[in-house]
A protein has these predicted regions:
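Extended, low-polarity segments enriched in aliphatic/aromatic residues
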Residues: 2-53, 58, 62-293
Length: 293
């Protein structure tokens, strides 16, 4: 497979997000879903909607999210809608909680390592294309949160998230934690789920990753560590595997004093196994060329 192109700028402004999307040379057709992370109630690190507004406006997109599979402000639709208001997403954009009403859509996983099916909020079927906006950071379970997590856990319904976390055992969030899969099985299930979304929107999906507020914890954490590294910049690609690999490499190759703390989180969770599995599933390559913009 030829190398994928990943664009990079150290500029960190709302306008730079638009520039990095435009760099990809793709016009997303039809009705555009924009996948964001709405940020758990109490989290201080999530990227605010004002930062994303120019690029979401540029694609005339609808902000999409799905309910979570654990306690908090986002595991049920009424609470999630209130959270979207509190965090001002609803003030600026059309919002779609894709699994607000059932039934979920079920997309088959081709040659899945763990899963045979992925459960997603049914409204995902209403969109022609997708812009995936990624706040790259650490994650307490996945090691890191990047493009592959946005495609998998991010687009899965509450039941689908449970299914991924349990390696295909159960879909009921109330019995998730006693059914958690082994770590590598969970990571492989994430890659399986990510592959269904990447393939569904093939040729009509773009990824922009923002390396800012680099905490070892995800935006899904109500209580999260403060950022441990300086901000890095913005990356974009049409390849989610290359993009995640490039983000990890930028952390690993930096001389930032917080690098080792961040990478300990990634490595202790075997985080890059998700990237390896996604590459094996054929949705991208870890061979990339970083083009500075």
């Amino acid at each position: 497979m030829a190398k994928s192109t990943v664009y990079f700028t150290s500029e960190l402004t709302p306008e730079a997000v638009v520039k990095m999307y435009r760099q990809l040379g793709i016009e997303l057709p039809g009705k555009v879903a924009v996948k964001v992370h709405s940020g758990e109630d109490g989290n201080q690190n999530y990227l605010h909607p004002e930062f994303m507004k120019p690029v979401i406006d540029a694609v005339n997109g609808t902000v999409v999210e799905c309910n979570t599979a654990y306690g908090g402000a986002r595991n049920e639709t009424p609470k999630h809608i209130e959270l979207m208001k509190k965090h001002h997403w609803s003030d600026l954009f059309d919002i779609d909680i894709m699994d607000a009403e059932g039934p979920d859509v079920e997309w088959p996983v081709e040659n899945g390592k763990v899963l045979k099916v992925n459960y997603l909020g049914k409204n995902i079927a209403n969109y022609d294309s997708m812009l995936v906006l990624i706040h790259f950071k650490g994650h307490p379970m996945g090691g890191y949160g990047g493009a592959l997590k946005q495609l998998s856990i991010g687009c899965a319904s509450s039941a689908g998230k449970t299914y991924i976390h349990t390696g295909g055992k159960v879909t009921d969030q109330h019995i998730l934690w006693e059914n958690c899969a082994e770590q590598d099985t969970f990571l492989e299930a994430m890659a399986d789920a990510a592959s269904t979304v990447a393939k569904h929107f093939a040729g009509k999906i773009a990824y922009v990753a923002i390396m800012k507020n680099l905490s070892v914890d995800c935006d899904c954490c109500a209580v999260a560590e403060d950022p441990c590294m300086n901000d890095v910049g913005i990356l974009s690609s049409l390849d989610p595997v290359a993009l995640d690999r490039a983000c990890i490499d930028l952390v690993m190759n930096s001389n930032d004093p917080g690098r080792d703390h961040f990478m300990e989180r990634v490595n202790s969770r075997h985080g890059t196994h998700t990237i390896d599995t996604a590459e094996a599933l054929g949705i991208g390559t870890q061979a990339y060329e970083l083009v500075k913009v």
